[in-house]
Amino acid sequence: MKLVIQRVSQAHVNVEGTTVGAIRTGLVVLVGISKSDTIKDADYLADKVLGLRIFPDNEGKMNRNVAEAHGAILIISQFTLYGDCRRGRRPSFDAAAAPGEALTLYNYFVDTVRKSPVPVETGTFQATMEVSLVNQGPVTIVIESEERNRK
């Protein structure tokens, strides 16, 4: 799994002109799922998202996680994170999981994050979405679950 995490002051996602998810202070998490991903990958990344200390403390140092910052999380599926542009000009998405397989793991990831006290909003899986956000900092972090095996 691959996540792009952005610290935001506000964000919302629309599908066909209707807002389906919105947050104020918090994290926007774009989620890409590959063919080889498992529940272990989702567990690892859910823990990372919830524990990531990228919010400022009283001294301005990045020392608080999203719960400590009284923030929320907006999770959005994005298979294009597995776009491979090494050959030609059109990305190949061969590494991305098939929609049914990806939906199961995406829902598991969302449900795992929702077990925390942090409010969670989502986009709509496999929909064309309009995502608007105000990146605070800016702070943008990319985390891949395969990193857990590199320790």
From Swiss-Prot:
InterPro entries: Daa-tRNA_deacyls_DTD, DTD-like_sf
Main subcellular location: cytoplasm
Reaction equations catalysed: glycyl-tRNA(Ala) + H2O = tRNA(Ala) + glycine + H(+); a D-aminoacyl-tRNA + H2O = a tRNA + a D-alpha-amino acid + H(+)
Subcellular location: Cytoplasm
Motif (Gly-cisPro motif, important for rejection of L-amino acids): 137-138
One function term, GO molecular function aspect: D-tyrosyl-tRNA(Tyr) deacylase activity
GO biological process, any: D-amino acid catabolic process
Function in brief: An aminoacyl-tRNA editing enzyme that deacylates mischarged D-aminoacyl-tRNAs. Also deacylates mischarged glycyl-tRNA(Ala), protecting cells against glycine mischarging by AlaRS. Acts via tRNA-based rather than protein-based catalysis; rejects L-amino acids rather than detecting D-amino acids in the active site. By recycling D-aminoacyl-tRNA to D-amino acids and free tRNA molecules, this enzyme counteracts the toxicity associated with the formation of D-aminoacyl-tRNA entities in vivo and helps enforce protein L-homochirality.
Domains as described in the record: A Gly-cisPro motif from one monomer fits into the active site of the other monomer to allow specific chiral rejection of L-amino acids.
Subunit organization: Homodimer.
PANTHER family the UniProt entry points to: D-AMINOACYL-TRNA DEACYLASE 1, D-TYROSYL-TRNA TYR DEACYLASE
The protein's name: D-aminoacyl-tRNA deacylase
Lineage: Bacteria, Pseudomonadati, Acidobacteriota, Terriglobia, Bryobacterales
Gene: dtd
